[in-house]
Amino acid sequence: MVSLLSCGTSASSHIVKKALTRLSLAMAAGLCFNLAAQEPTPPIITPTSPSVTIPLQTYADEQAIVKSANNLNTETKVRFAKTANFDSDTVVKIARKLAQKPYVELKDPLPPGLAKISYDEYRDIRFKPEASIWKAEGLPYQMQLFHRGFYFQDLIEIALVEGKQASHLAYNSEFFTAGDVLSQRLPTQDIGYSGLRIHYPLNNPAYFDELMVFQGASYFRALGKGSDYGLSSRGLALNTAEPEGEEFPIFRAFWVERPNTDSNLIVVHALLDSPSVAGAYRFSVRPGENTHIDVEATLFPRVDLVKVGLAPSTSMFLHSMNGRQNTDDFRPEVHDSDALLILNGRGERLWRPLANPKQLQVSAFMDNSPQGFGLIQRERSFDAYQDLEAHYERRPSLWVEPVGNWGAGEVVLTEIPTDSEIHDNIVSYWKPKQPIAAGSEFHFTYRLIWGSEPEVDDGTVIVARTASGRAEIAKATPRRLFVIDYQVKEGNNDEIPVAKVQSSAGVVTNVVVSRQPKTNGYRLAFEMDPQDAELIELRAELKFTGPRDVETWLYRWTL
């Protein structure tokens, strides 16, 4: 069973149910999960440090209790997030050592009663807000933990870091409440956790909102001010949409640095592992209108990583005004993201609306040293969605800014057919041109921006809306009508541009550009006759007499 991301107990039931019941992307694509059972082998790292259950006290008290645990006789075996010295290279050293040995599938079975609990029973296990880490100290952040159970079977280790010292955070049943639905007691032994979430007064200085969640494989997600949980990021993507099946690395352990009282920065370190690669990650999180997360990662491949995706994002697209064939839904649009935006190495802005295709499809956009890319939720009007529970207009965009020169490669977009909004079916990532060699150390850095999409300069012309339908109302026809509305950002639209529309097949006719007063921009309309083609790549550009920053519209039409 693939671990899936939970958005926490405080989110709406709609969002929680989607997160807990979403299928893996490989399964949604009709692929197999590529982690075959292996023969038991000795553990990679011999555990030496004991762990301890930490009662609900101040951090200073927690430190004293952890130190006193050295004399305790405990059966808990801490593999990674041990009570030990800690510095900026600690996780890198652990990942390097891990990669030097064959992968071992860790087996940490839950007690039988917890291993097979239902969705409703899992939801009945809640973290006590009063037990939040650092709550008693009045720090700008608090941390809560996720219990294991249901889809979340993997044991995740967590350590708290203060200065040069890491202290293992053992499982404590007193951190949780279990209601009448669960009808069983929580275990007393250290079973670990399934993830963590960071809280911060993002929207109200008097309330600690959920800010960021790590749970399920290498999935994580965050919020900007005023947004709701939507799309997710991952530590790494491997073999996405490949016939042999996708491989899902997992964050095995986290080290969370104690935040300072006078800073809005919190730092989380993570250890990644899978059959193909081990890795060390450092997340520097700064919340705000847009939440910025600086990611520093070092990969240690066990095998050549050929089909690897860096900075992957995972989202959902069910339908929009661009193609609602066979859609019986009162809501005009249903999606967490409506397009892929790319700012390539040449400075060209590419806008590629998403699709829910009949068959799995993969698009690749070749580039050299991209400036940024991401899955964007540009439509912010409630009227576009009409969903009082899901509120898709509040879902964040996720923009990826590479730091340094990422060289040659391609932005890859994978679109998977789905018939339900609870299934994530969109993936984007950067694929380097050259494989990452086995035995090497591959370091890369990037920034994730959660919230609004990147600001553009005044006068920039961006795509505001894409719609399509049959070209004739009175009778059926294979010809398609495309209507693209553009918006001028804080500028005038005195000049009517000339449109250049290209297609890889078929015939494009009746190209018309007019003013669109509702967007302070333009409307481009054209017809496309596919003729015998089953797949057509479309490209539309607006040409002005002088220099102007204009988004290039791209789309893949399929029969």
From Swiss-Prot:
User: What UniProt keywords apply to this chain's record, in alphabetical order?
Assistant: Periplasm, Signal
Organism the protein comes from: Shewanella frigidimarina (strain NCIMB 400)
Q: Name one GO molecular function term.
A: carbohydrate binding
Part of which pathway? Glycan metabolism; osmoregulated periplasmic glucan (OPG) biosynthesis
Q: Which family does the record assign?
A: Belongs to the OpgD/OpgG family.
What Pfam families does this protein's entry cite?
A: MdoG
Function per UniProt:
Involved in the biosynthesis of osmoregulated periplasmic glucans (OPGs).
The signal peptide, as residue positions, is 1-37
**Gene Ontology terms: biological process:** beta-glucan biosynthetic process
Task: Give the InterPro entries listed for this entry.
Answer: Gal_mutarotase_sf_dom (IPR011013), GH-type_carb-bd (IPR014718), Glucan_biosyn_MdoG/MdoD (IPR014438), Glucan_biosyn_MdoG_C (IPR007444), Ig-like_fold (IPR013783), Ig_E-set (IPR014756), MdoG_OpgG (IPR023704)
Cellular localization per UniProt: Periplasm
Q: What is this protein called?
A: Glucans biosynthesis protein G
Enumerate the transmembrane spans: none
Q: Tell me a GO cellular component.
A: outer membrane-bounded periplasmic space
